[in-house]
């Protein structure tokens, strides 16, 4: 889990727009966040496999 202080810092509006960055809405992870879902790759996989994300299916070919 991410530190609460860092999550609060990311939620506040930065002085300059370039400093803004995305965090996972579920766990607060700063890396590999999918903008479309607002989730990191780990949370996205967990929720997709549990069937909590409508329209997302496991790929097979």
UniProtKB/Swiss-Prot annotation:
Spell out the Pfam families in the cross-references.
Ribosomal_S14 (PF00253)
Which molecular-function annotations from GO does this UniProt entry contain? Answer: rRNA binding; structural constituent of ribosome; zinc ion binding
- Domain of life, source organism: Bacteria
- Keyword set for this entry? Metal-binding, Ribonucleoprotein, Ribosomal protein, RNA-binding, rRNA-binding, Zinc
GO terms in the biological process aspect are: translation
- Cofactor or coenzyme needed: Zn(2+)
Gene3D superfamilies recorded:
30s Ribosomal Protein S14, Chain N
> Which GO terms of the cellular component aspect does the record hold?
cytoplasm; small ribosomal subunit
Q: Which SUPFAM superfamilies does the record associate with it?
A: Glucocorticoid receptor-like (DNA-binding domain) (SSF57716)
Q: How is the cofactor bound?
A: Binds 1 zinc ion per subunit.
Where is Zn(2+) annotated to bind?
Answer: 24, 27, 40, 43
Q: Which family does it belong to?
A: Belongs to the universal ribosomal protein uS14 family. Zinc-binding uS14 subfamily.
HAMAP family in alphabetical order: Ribosomal_uS14_2_B
Q: What does this protein do?
A: Binds 16S rRNA, required for the assembly of 30S particles and may also be responsible for determining the conformation of the 16S rRNA at the A site.
Which NCBIfam families does its entry note? PRK08061.1 (NF005974)
Q: Describe the protein's quaternary organization and the partners it interacts with.
A: Part of the 30S ribosomal subunit. Contacts proteins S3 and S10.
- Put simply, this protein is called Small ribosomal subunit protein uS14
Report which gene this protein is encoded by. Answer: rpsZ
């Amino acid at each position: 889990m991410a530190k609460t202080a860092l999550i609060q810092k990311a939620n506040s509006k930065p002085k300059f727009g370039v400093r803004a960055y995305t965090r996972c809405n579920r766990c607060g992870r700063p890396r590999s966040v999918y903008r479309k879902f607002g989730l990191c790759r780990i949370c996205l996989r967990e929720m997709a496999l549990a069937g909590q994300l409508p329209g997302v299916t496991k790929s097979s070919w």
